[in-house]
């Protein structure tokens, strides 16, 4: 699977206070929807990812239900968080 520059940039360093829109698969529209639901930072979405025990199906379904992410967007976001966890946790 090839990854986007956004994905590579995200997983290359600690998350810190990065905005939710810095996650691969999350653009301006989805980012705004997530922010409206309290998921304003990438680390808050990471928390949900971890609560769901890094389960791909559960996380992607949650992302779809929460902000309307399509299959590619949810797959990109999941892959980004999974790779970040592999590198930093």
From Swiss-Prot:
Substitution effect: residue 29 to A: No effect on histone H1/H3 binding
Query: Which domain of life does the protein's organism represent?
Result: Eukaryota
Query: Altering residue 75 to E: what's the impact?
Result: Reduces binding to dsDNA. No effect on histone H1/H3 binding
Q: How does it assemble?
A: Homodimer. Heterodimerizes with BANF2. Interacts with ANKLE2/LEM4, leading to decreased phosphorylation by VRK1 and promoting dephosphorylation by protein phosphatase 2A (PP2A). Binds non-specifically to double-stranded DNA, and is found as a hexamer or dodecamer upon DNA binding. Binds to LEM domain-containing nuclear proteins such as LEMD3/MAN1, TMPO/LAP2 and EMD (emerin). Interacts with ANKLE1 (via LEM domain); the interaction may favor BANF1 dimerization. Interacts with CRX and LMNA (lamin-A). Binds linker histone H1.1 and core histones H3. Interacts with LEMD2 (via LEM domain).
> Where is it mainly found?
nucleus
Q: Which UniProt keywords apply?
A: Acetylation, Chromosome, Cytoplasm, Disease variant, DNA-binding, Host-virus interaction, Nucleus, Osteoporosis, Phosphoprotein
Q: Where in the cell is it found?
A: Nucleus; Chromosome; Nucleus envelope; Cytoplasm
Please describe, based on the UniProt annotation, the reported consequence of changing residue 8 to A: Enhances histone H1/H3 binding
Q: Which GO terms describe its cellular component?
A: chromatin; condensed chromosome; cytoplasm; cytosol; nuclear envelope; nucleoplasm; nucleus
- Please give the annotated consequence of changing residue 80 to A: No effect on histone H1/H3 and LEMD3/MAN1 binding
* Residues recorded with modification (Microbial infection) Phosphothreonine: 2-3
What does the annotation give as the result of altering residue 4 to D? 75% cytoplasmic localization
How are the domains described in the entry?
Has a helix-hairpin-helix (HhH) structural motif conserved among proteins that bind non-specifically to DNA. LEM domain proteins bind centrally on the BAF dimer.
Under which name does UniProt file this protein? Barrier-to-autointegration factor
Quote the annotated effect of residue 32 to E.
Answer: No effect on histone H1/H3 binding
PANTHER family per the UniProt record, alphabetical:
BARRIER TO AUTOINTEGRATION FACTOR 2, BARRIER-TO-AUTOINTEGRATION FACTOR
Effect the entry attributes to changing residue 50 to K:
Fails to promote HIV-1 genome integration
Tell me where in this chain the PTM N-acetylmethionine is found: 1
Task: List every position bearing Phosphoserine.
Answer: 4
Please give the residue positions where the record annotates the modification N-acetylthreonine. Answer: 2
As annotated, the protein's associated disorder is:
Nestor-Guillermo progeria syndrome: An atypical progeroid syndrome characterized by normal development in the first years of life, later followed by the emergence of generalized lipoatrophy, severe osteoporosis, and marked osteolysis. The atrophic facial subcutaneous fat pad and the marked osteolysis of the maxilla and mandible result in a typical pseudosenile facial appearance with micrognathia, prominent subcutaneous venous patterning, a convex nasal ridge, and proptosis. Cognitive development is completely normal.
> What gene name is listed for this protein?
BANF1
Tell me, what's a Pfam family for it? SAM_BAF
List, for all copies, the residue spans of the domain called HhH.
20-35
């Amino acid at each position: 699977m090839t990854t986007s520059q956004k994905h590579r940039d995200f997983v290359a360093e600690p998350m810190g206070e990065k905005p939710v829109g810095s996650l691969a698969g999350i653009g301006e529209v989805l980012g705004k929807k997530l922010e409206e639901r309290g998921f304003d930072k990438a680390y808050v979405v990471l928390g949900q990812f971890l609560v769901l025990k890094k389960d791909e199906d559960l996380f992607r379904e949650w992302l779809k239900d929460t902000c309307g992410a399509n299959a590619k967007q949810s797959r990109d976001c999941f892959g980004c968080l999974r790779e970040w966890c592999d590198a930093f946790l």
